[in-house]
Amino acid sequence: MSYEQEPEDGPYTRWVQSTIQNPRKAYRAMFYVAAIFFIVTTLFPFYWLLVLALTPLARISNMGLVPKGFNPGSFVEMFQLLPFHRYMFNSIAIALTTTVIVLFIGSFAGYAFGRLEFRGRTGLLLLLLAISYFPPAAFILPLFNFFTGNVSVLGVSSPSWFNTPGALVTPFSGLYMPLTIFILTTFYGQIPDGLEDAARVEGATRIGALFRVIMPLSAPGVATAGVLTFISVYNEFFFSFLMTDGQAQHWAPIVWGILNYQGQFQAYYNLMAAASIVGVLPVAVLVVIAQERIVSGLTAGALKE
């Protein structure tokens, strides 16, 4: 009498059976797959920029996933061909100025919306929310006419701010103000009233209590709003393209500098890649320094005690 041997289970079948018995394996596998996918899709563009920057210009047309040649001189040549350091300075200066203005004004607005009771508060918040939904392109025509001196009120023409930092800082401040106000309103509203009352008893005014008590206790929210504003302004190009002529001495930002490596007859892709890598360093350093504040700010801002 012969017995048929049952076929042995394959590795996939055994893994499925073990997963059914222990669901944590499935969750762990899903986590690893998602993490690997996120890491690859996030880091690959930076790797490709590095390959472009290190590949000699003559070999870029035949390049693959690894550099064909090794030419670190691109990181030096990029400063020799254009004053890229000036473009970086322009972006950093405009981003810092906008961030300070947005945080200063947004702090007062956040304090008013988060800690004061007044008629029409909800309506004003909804109005801010509605304004933030407008695309930036909707404001470009009136802003361009205003900043080029083509608007006249009672015979007085608007100032000509074309190719000046004011033409960039002003729209950026208005564009990123609503998000900052919403973040700070949430954080300021969570501070116990007793802490502010104690400062008021000691003789502090409302403004003094805001800067001495409310803002220090809301440091994660302030840092989050500041970093998000800085990064957004640093990377912005739409308004900069229309409000400047692309010259470094006229406050053109970093994206203008990268695009200027593309000439009429030739594009220096290796220099564009090198400039992109150098240009992202200030933002990367800022995020590394403030990452704990950003994470705590983004998570704590969604919770209420």
What are these regions (language model features)?
Residues S2-T13, R28-E305:
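A structural signal for multi-pass alpha-helical bundles of membrane permease subunits
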Residues R14-S18:
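Short glycine/proline-rich turn/loop motifs
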Residues Q21, K25:
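Conserved catalytic/binding loops enriched for acidic/polar residues
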